[in-house]
Amino acid sequence: MTTRGKTSFILAGAAVLFLALAPGSPAQENSHRGDFAFMTTASEEMPLSDGHVLMRVVQSGMIFADDPASPIDRTATTCSGSTVMEASARATVISGHCDGVDADGDVWTIWYAGDQDGGDWGYMGGTGKFEGIKGGGTFSAEAQWSDGRGINAWEGTYTLR
């Protein structure tokens, strides 16, 4: 093999190695929406000095995305949060966090904040396929039953690494 041939071979090999080690294409932002159907599994109330009530709740349920390709579709989800309620029972402040576990055992986590009508949420992180997830969106309360069941609608964006 000539010197020129060896040089071309080495450069071609280096190019293949560079491409193999280069990070993948830039992550793409995707949209998704759906519902969170839940049941309140724990709740406690604490009267506050100004007549408001602090309610701490744990809710468990399932995420149903409108598009089955959404990575969080059909994830078992648990949320823990606090709600400040007026004497009229109107929720003025709602905040907390949720974690979802998919069929593969990968976990995503979000924060949320709003009032009884809805609010904002955002991804905090995750494991496995959700490691490095970014994004967020909005939610709204759709239905609440007196036995602790409910449905919240959500929409937002996500970017996976």
Task: Explain the meaning of each model-derived region.
Residues 11-20:
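Bacterial N-terminal signal peptides
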Residues 19-22, 67:
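Generic N-terminal simple sequence motifs
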Residues 26-161:
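Beta-strand-enriched cores of mature, soluble protein domains
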